[in-house]
Protein backbone atom coordinates (compact mmCIF):
# COMPACT_ATOMS: atom_id res chain seq x y z
CA UNK A 1 0.00 0.00 0.00
CA UNK A 2 0.99 3.63 0.41
CA UNK A 3 2.43 2.79 3.84
CA UNK A 4 6.09 2.74 2.69
CA UNK A 5 5.58 6.24 1.26
CA UNK A 6 2.97 8.07 3.34
CA UNK A 7 4.28 6.61 6.61
CA UNK A 8 7.88 7.83 6.16
CA UNK A 9 6.64 11.25 5.02
CA UNK A 10 4.62 11.55 8.23
CA UNK A 11 7.49 10.03 10.20
CA UNK A 12 9.84 12.71 8.87
CA UNK A 13 8.04 15.12 11.21
CA UNK A 14 9.85 13.36 14.05
CA UNK A 15 13.21 14.21 12.49
CA UNK A 16 16.07 12.04 11.17
CA UNK A 17 15.49 9.42 13.87
CA UNK A 18 12.75 8.16 11.54
CA UNK A 19 15.40 6.97 9.10
CA UNK A 20 17.16 5.07 11.87
CA UNK A 21 13.94 3.21 12.70
CA UNK A 22 13.41 2.34 9.02
CA UNK A 23 16.90 0.83 8.70
CA UNK A 24 16.90 -1.08 11.99
CA UNK A 25 13.26 -2.12 11.77
CA UNK A 26 13.50 -3.29 8.17
CA UNK A 27 16.63 -5.42 8.66
CA UNK A 28 15.96 -6.92 12.08
CA UNK A 29 12.14 -6.94 12.26
CA UNK A 30 10.29 -6.55 8.97
CA UNK A 31 12.49 -8.72 6.75
CA UNK A 32 12.84 -11.40 9.44
CA UNK A 33 9.07 -11.42 9.93
CA UNK A 34 8.41 -11.77 6.19
CA UNK A 35 11.02 -14.51 5.74
CA UNK A 36 9.72 -16.44 8.75
CA UNK A 37 6.10 -16.30 7.57
CA UNK A 38 7.09 -17.13 4.02
CA UNK A 39 9.17 -20.16 4.97
CA UNK A 40 6.41 -21.44 7.25
CA UNK A 41 4.05 -21.33 4.30
CA UNK A 42 6.57 -22.84 1.85
CA UNK A 43 7.27 -25.81 4.14
CA UNK A 44 3.55 -26.40 4.64
CA UNK A 45 2.57 -26.52 0.98
CA UNK A 46 1.62 -22.85 0.66
CA UNK A 47 -0.70 -22.91 3.67
CA UNK A 48 -2.36 -19.65 4.72
CA UNK A 49 -1.86 -18.05 8.12
CA UNK A 50 -5.20 -19.35 9.51
CA UNK A 51 -4.28 -22.90 8.50
CA UNK A 52 -0.84 -22.55 10.03
CA UNK A 53 -2.43 -21.20 13.21
CA UNK A 54 -4.75 -24.20 13.27
CA UNK A 55 -1.90 -26.64 12.78
CA UNK A 56 0.31 -25.25 15.53
CA UNK A 57 -2.19 -23.61 17.92
CA UNK A 58 -5.42 -25.58 17.51
CA UNK A 59 -8.83 -25.28 15.83
CA UNK A 60 -10.28 -22.50 18.05
CA UNK A 61 -7.35 -20.25 17.17
CA UNK A 62 -7.75 -21.15 13.49
CA UNK A 63 -11.42 -20.10 13.55
CA UNK A 64 -10.57 -16.82 15.25
CA UNK A 65 -7.72 -16.04 12.83
CA UNK A 66 -9.97 -16.89 9.88
CA UNK A 67 -12.58 -14.32 10.91
CA UNK A 68 -9.97 -11.72 11.84
CA UNK A 69 -8.02 -12.19 8.60
CA UNK A 70 -11.08 -11.91 6.35
CA UNK A 71 -12.38 -8.78 8.09
CA UNK A 72 -9.00 -7.05 8.05
CA UNK A 73 -8.23 -8.05 4.46
CA UNK A 74 -11.56 -6.66 3.26
CA UNK A 75 -10.94 -3.43 5.16
CA UNK A 76 -7.45 -3.15 3.68
CA UNK A 77 -8.81 -3.69 0.18
CA UNK A 78 -11.43 -0.97 0.61
CA UNK A 79 -8.95 1.50 2.11
CA UNK A 80 -6.56 0.96 -0.78
CA UNK A 81 -9.09 2.31 -3.25
CA UNK A 82 -9.17 5.89 -1.95
CA UNK A 83 -5.50 6.88 -2.20
CA UNK A 84 -4.85 5.63 -5.77
CA UNK A 85 -8.17 7.09 -6.96
CA UNK A 86 -7.22 10.46 -5.47
CA UNK A 87 -3.80 10.46 -7.15
CA UNK A 88 -5.18 9.22 -10.48
CA UNK A 89 -7.83 11.93 -10.37
CA UNK A 90 -5.15 14.56 -9.86
CA UNK A 91 -3.05 13.16 -12.70
CA UNK A 92 -6.05 13.06 -15.04
CA UNK A 93 -6.99 16.67 -14.38
CA UNK A 94 -3.42 17.88 -14.84
CA UNK A 95 -2.82 15.91 -18.04
CA UNK A 96 -6.04 17.22 -19.58
CA UNK A 97 -5.06 20.72 -18.49
CA UNK A 98 -1.75 20.39 -20.31
CA UNK A 99 -3.38 18.77 -23.36
CA UNK A 100 -5.90 21.59 -23.68
CA UNK A 101 -3.10 23.90 -24.79
CA UNK A 102 -4.27 26.73 -22.57
CA UNK A 103 -1.58 25.98 -20.01
CA UNK A 104 2.08 25.29 -20.70
CA UNK A 105 3.11 21.69 -20.02
CA UNK A 106 6.30 23.05 -18.46
CA UNK A 107 4.33 24.92 -15.80
CA UNK A 108 3.13 21.95 -13.78
CA UNK A 109 2.29 24.03 -10.73
CA UNK A 110 -0.03 26.29 -12.74
CA UNK A 111 -1.82 23.27 -14.21
CA UNK A 112 -2.30 21.80 -10.76
CA UNK A 113 -3.65 25.05 -9.30
CA UNK A 114 -6.13 25.56 -12.13
CA UNK A 115 -7.34 21.96 -11.84
CA UNK A 116 -7.79 22.31 -8.09
CA UNK A 117 -9.78 25.52 -8.58
CA UNK A 118 -12.19 23.76 -10.92
CA UNK A 119 -10.96 25.53 -14.04
CA UNK A 120 -10.37 22.23 -15.86
CA UNK A 121 -12.98 19.60 -16.64
CA UNK A 122 -12.65 16.18 -18.26
CA UNK A 123 -15.57 15.44 -20.60
CA UNK A 124 -17.68 17.76 -18.47
CA UNK A 125 -16.64 16.16 -15.17
CA UNK A 126 -15.01 18.08 -12.34
CA UNK A 127 -12.24 16.60 -10.21
CA UNK A 128 -14.56 15.01 -7.62
CA UNK A 129 -16.46 13.18 -10.37
CA UNK A 130 -13.22 12.03 -12.00
CA UNK A 131 -12.06 10.59 -8.67
CA UNK A 132 -15.38 8.72 -8.38
CA UNK A 133 -14.89 7.26 -11.86
CA UNK A 134 -11.38 6.10 -10.97
CA UNK A 135 -12.75 4.56 -7.78
CA UNK A 136 -15.16 2.49 -9.86
CA UNK A 137 -12.44 1.45 -12.31
CA UNK A 138 -10.13 0.35 -9.50
CA UNK A 139 -12.93 -1.65 -7.84
CA UNK A 140 -13.66 -3.43 -11.13
CA UNK A 141 -9.97 -4.30 -11.47
CA UNK A 142 -9.93 -5.63 -7.90
CA UNK A 143 -12.88 -7.90 -8.65
CA UNK A 144 -11.24 -9.28 -11.80
CA UNK A 145 -7.88 -9.76 -10.07
CA UNK A 146 -9.64 -11.53 -7.19
CA UNK A 147 -11.55 -13.99 -9.36
CA UNK A 148 -9.23 -14.74 -12.29
CA UNK A 149 -6.11 -16.95 -12.04
CA UNK A 150 -2.86 -15.19 -11.12
CA UNK A 151 -1.35 -15.61 -14.59
CA UNK A 152 -4.34 -13.98 -16.34
CA UNK A 153 -4.11 -10.46 -14.91
CA UNK A 154 -1.76 -10.07 -11.95
CA UNK A 155 1.10 -11.99 -13.55
CA UNK A 156 0.82 -9.99 -16.77
CA UNK A 157 0.56 -6.42 -15.47
CA UNK A 158 2.80 -6.64 -12.40
CA UNK A 159 6.00 -6.40 -14.50
CA UNK A 160 4.75 -3.00 -15.72
CA UNK A 161 3.89 -2.04 -12.15
CA UNK A 162 7.39 -3.06 -11.12
CA UNK A 163 8.91 -0.89 -13.85
CA UNK A 164 6.92 2.12 -12.61
CA UNK A 165 8.00 1.41 -9.04
CA UNK A 166 11.64 1.22 -10.12
CA UNK A 167 11.33 4.46 -12.08
CA UNK A 168 9.75 6.18 -9.10
CA UNK A 169 12.50 5.07 -6.70
CA UNK A 170 15.43 5.85 -9.01
CA UNK A 171 13.79 9.05 -10.23
CA UNK A 172 13.29 10.49 -6.76
CA UNK A 173 16.88 9.62 -5.77
CA UNK A 174 18.05 11.35 -8.95
CA UNK A 175 15.85 14.33 -8.13
CA UNK A 176 17.26 14.63 -4.63
CA UNK A 177 20.87 14.36 -5.81
CA UNK A 178 20.46 16.73 -8.76
CA UNK A 179 18.62 19.27 -6.60
CA UNK A 180 21.43 19.07 -4.05
CA UNK A 181 23.97 19.89 -6.79
CA UNK A 182 21.82 22.54 -8.48
CA UNK A 183 23.07 26.11 -8.41
CA UNK A 184 19.73 27.62 -9.44
CA UNK A 185 17.46 25.99 -6.84
CA UNK A 186 19.53 23.90 -4.43
CA UNK A 187 17.77 21.55 -2.04
CA UNK A 188 20.26 20.06 0.40
CA UNK A 189 19.71 16.65 1.92
CA UNK A 190 18.00 17.00 5.32
CA UNK A 191 18.12 20.79 5.11
CA UNK A 192 15.27 20.96 7.62
CA UNK A 193 17.65 19.52 10.25
CA UNK A 194 20.94 20.78 8.83
CA UNK A 195 23.74 21.54 11.27
CA UNK A 196 22.31 19.65 14.22
CA UNK A 197 24.54 17.95 16.74
CA UNK A 198 24.75 14.17 17.04
CA UNK A 199 22.68 14.21 20.21
CA UNK A 200 19.82 15.97 18.44
CA UNK A 201 19.74 13.22 15.83
CA UNK A 202 17.65 11.22 18.32
CA UNK A 203 15.53 14.18 19.37
CA UNK A 204 11.79 14.29 18.78
CA UNK A 205 11.19 17.18 16.36
CA UNK A 206 7.43 16.72 16.47
CA UNK A 207 6.18 19.94 18.06
CA UNK A 208 2.80 18.60 19.18
CA UNK A 209 3.04 17.34 22.76
CA UNK A 210 0.37 14.68 22.25
CA UNK A 211 2.55 12.89 19.65
CA UNK A 212 5.50 11.43 21.59
CA UNK A 213 8.32 9.66 19.81
CA UNK A 214 7.62 6.47 21.74
CA UNK A 215 5.54 4.63 20.64
CA UNK A 216 3.96 6.72 17.87
CA UNK A 217 6.97 6.76 15.53
CA UNK A 218 6.78 2.98 15.28
CA UNK A 219 3.05 3.15 14.55
CA UNK A 220 3.48 5.95 12.02
CA UNK A 221 6.15 4.07 10.06
CA UNK A 222 5.04 0.45 9.95
CA UNK A 223 5.19 -0.50 6.27
CA UNK A 224 8.79 0.02 5.24
CA UNK A 225 10.01 -1.17 8.64
CA UNK A 226 7.61 -3.85 9.89
CA UNK A 227 4.26 -4.88 8.40
CA UNK A 228 2.01 -7.65 9.67
CA UNK A 229 -0.07 -7.39 6.48
CA UNK A 230 2.75 -9.14 4.64
CA UNK A 231 2.02 -12.34 6.55
CA UNK A 232 -1.33 -12.62 4.78
CA UNK A 233 0.39 -12.32 1.41
CA UNK A 234 3.13 -14.87 2.06
CA UNK A 235 1.05 -17.88 0.90
CA UNK A 236 0.44 -16.22 -2.47
CA UNK A 237 4.19 -16.01 -3.04
CA UNK A 238 4.91 -19.36 -1.39
CA UNK A 239 2.70 -21.09 -3.94
CA UNK A 240 4.75 -19.53 -6.73
CA UNK A 241 8.13 -20.41 -5.18
CA UNK A 242 9.84 -23.30 -6.96
CA UNK A 243 12.73 -23.82 -4.52
CA UNK A 244 13.41 -22.94 -0.89
CA UNK A 245 16.66 -21.31 -2.00
CA UNK A 246 14.58 -18.58 -3.62
CA UNK A 247 12.85 -17.72 -0.35
CA UNK A 248 15.53 -15.42 1.04
CA UNK A 249 15.46 -13.24 -2.07
CA UNK A 250 11.66 -13.32 -2.38
CA UNK A 251 10.65 -12.74 1.24
CA UNK A 252 13.65 -11.14 2.96
CA UNK A 253 14.82 -9.27 -0.13
CA UNK A 254 11.42 -7.82 -0.97
CA UNK A 255 11.16 -6.27 2.48
CA UNK A 256 14.62 -4.74 2.11
CA UNK A 257 13.44 -3.23 -1.18
CA UNK A 258 10.42 -1.77 0.59
CA UNK A 259 12.72 -0.31 3.23
CA UNK A 260 14.76 1.43 0.53
CA UNK A 261 11.59 3.02 -0.85
CA UNK A 262 10.69 4.17 2.67
CA UNK A 263 14.14 5.73 3.10
CA UNK A 264 13.81 7.61 -0.18
CA UNK A 265 10.49 9.19 0.79
CA UNK A 266 11.62 9.95 4.32
CA UNK A 267 14.57 11.80 2.75
CA UNK A 268 12.10 13.70 0.55
CA UNK A 269 10.11 14.68 3.64
CA UNK A 270 13.25 15.93 5.39
CA UNK A 271 14.63 17.74 2.33
CA UNK A 272 11.93 19.09 0.06
CA UNK A 273 10.55 21.75 2.39
CA UNK A 274 12.51 24.49 4.11
CA UNK A 275 11.59 23.22 7.56
CA UNK A 276 9.56 20.55 9.31
CA UNK A 277 6.74 23.04 10.09
CA UNK A 278 6.49 23.66 6.34
CA UNK A 279 6.22 19.89 5.80
CA UNK A 280 3.45 19.74 8.40
CA UNK A 281 1.61 22.60 6.68
CA UNK A 282 1.77 20.76 3.34
CA UNK A 283 0.44 17.57 4.91
CA UNK A 284 -2.41 19.48 6.56
CA UNK A 285 -3.23 21.16 3.24
CA UNK A 286 -3.54 17.96 1.26
CA UNK A 287 -2.35 14.86 3.14
CA UNK A 288 0.95 13.10 2.31
CA UNK A 289 -0.31 12.66 -1.26
CA UNK A 290 0.26 16.39 -1.77
CA UNK A 291 3.90 15.97 -0.70
CA UNK A 292 4.26 13.05 -3.13
CA UNK A 293 2.73 14.95 -6.03
CA UNK A 294 4.45 18.29 -5.44
CA UNK A 295 7.92 16.81 -4.90
CA UNK A 296 7.63 14.45 -7.91
CA UNK A 297 6.58 17.27 -10.24
CA UNK A 298 9.28 19.58 -8.86
CA UNK A 299 12.13 17.09 -9.21
CA UNK A 300 11.13 15.37 -12.47
CA UNK A 301 8.84 17.79 -14.31
CA UNK A 302 5.24 17.12 -15.31
CA UNK A 303 5.85 14.03 -17.47
CA UNK A 304 8.51 12.43 -15.26
CA UNK A 305 6.61 13.43 -12.15
CA UNK A 306 3.44 11.76 -13.38
CA UNK A 307 5.33 8.52 -14.02
CA UNK A 308 6.79 8.78 -10.52
CA UNK A 309 3.32 9.31 -9.04
CA UNK A 310 2.08 6.30 -11.03
CA UNK A 311 4.86 4.35 -9.31
CA UNK A 312 3.29 5.41 -6.02
CA UNK A 313 -0.21 4.53 -7.26
CA UNK A 314 0.72 0.91 -8.02
CA UNK A 315 1.61 0.26 -4.37
CA UNK A 316 -1.92 0.50 -2.92
CA UNK A 317 -3.37 -1.14 -6.04
CA UNK A 318 -1.10 -4.16 -5.70
CA UNK A 319 -2.00 -4.39 -2.02
CA UNK A 320 -5.73 -3.99 -2.62
CA UNK A 321 -6.00 -6.68 -5.28
CA UNK A 322 -3.95 -9.21 -3.30
CA UNK A 323 -5.88 -8.38 -0.12
CA UNK A 324 -9.20 -9.27 -1.76
CA UNK A 325 -7.61 -12.32 -3.38
CA UNK A 326 -6.20 -13.51 -0.06
CA UNK A 327 -9.63 -13.00 1.56
CA UNK A 328 -11.21 -15.11 -1.18
CA UNK A 329 -8.69 -17.92 -0.62
CA UNK A 330 -9.15 -17.84 3.16
CA UNK A 331 -12.94 -18.11 2.78
CA UNK A 332 -12.62 -20.89 0.19
CA UNK A 333 -10.24 -22.90 2.36
CA UNK A 334 -12.40 -22.45 5.45
CA UNK A 335 -15.53 -23.75 3.69
CA UNK A 336 -13.58 -26.25 1.54
CA UNK A 337 -14.82 -24.71 -1.68
CA UNK A 338 -13.44 -25.94 -5.01
CA UNK A 339 -11.51 -23.18 -6.82
CA UNK A 340 -10.54 -24.79 -10.12
CA UNK A 341 -13.10 -23.02 -12.32
CA UNK A 342 -14.02 -19.33 -12.62
CA UNK A 343 -17.65 -20.04 -11.75
CA UNK A 344 -16.57 -21.45 -8.38
Give residue ranges: language-model regions:
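Hydrophobic alpha-helical segments and their helix-loop junctions in multi-pass secondary transporters
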Residues: 77-98, 104-108, 132-133, 145-146, ...
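Selective recognition of specific alpha-helical transmembrane segments in multi-pass small-molecule
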Residues: 69, 73-78, 162-179, 227, ...
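Flexible loop linkers connecting adjacent transmembrane helices
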Residues: 7-11, 16, 32-61, 96, ...
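Loop-to-transmembrane helix boundary motifs in multi-pass membrane proteins
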Residues: 59-66, 70-71, 128-137, 253-263, ...
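Transmembrane alpha-helical segments of multi-pass small-molecule transport proteins
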Residues: 65-72, 92-149, 165-168, 339-344
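Extracellular/periplasmic helix-exit of transmembrane alpha-helices
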Residues: 176-200, 254-294
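Hydrophobic, small-residue-rich membrane helices and short re-entrant helix-turn-helix hairpins
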Residues: 49, 148-162, 229-262, 278-292, ...
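Membrane-helix boundary/coupling elements in multi-pass transport proteins
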Residues: 3-9, 45, 72-87, 219-240, ...
Amino acid sequence: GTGPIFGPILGALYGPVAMLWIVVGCIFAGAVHDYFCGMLSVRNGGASMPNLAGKYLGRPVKAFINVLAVVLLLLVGVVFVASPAQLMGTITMDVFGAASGSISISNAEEIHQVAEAGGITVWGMDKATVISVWTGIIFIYYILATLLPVDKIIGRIYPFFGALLLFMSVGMVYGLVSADLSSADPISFYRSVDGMSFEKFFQNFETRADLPLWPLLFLTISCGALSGFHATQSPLMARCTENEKEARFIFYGAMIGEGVIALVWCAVGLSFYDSLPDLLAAIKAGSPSKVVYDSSIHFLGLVGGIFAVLGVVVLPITSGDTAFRAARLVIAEFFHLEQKTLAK
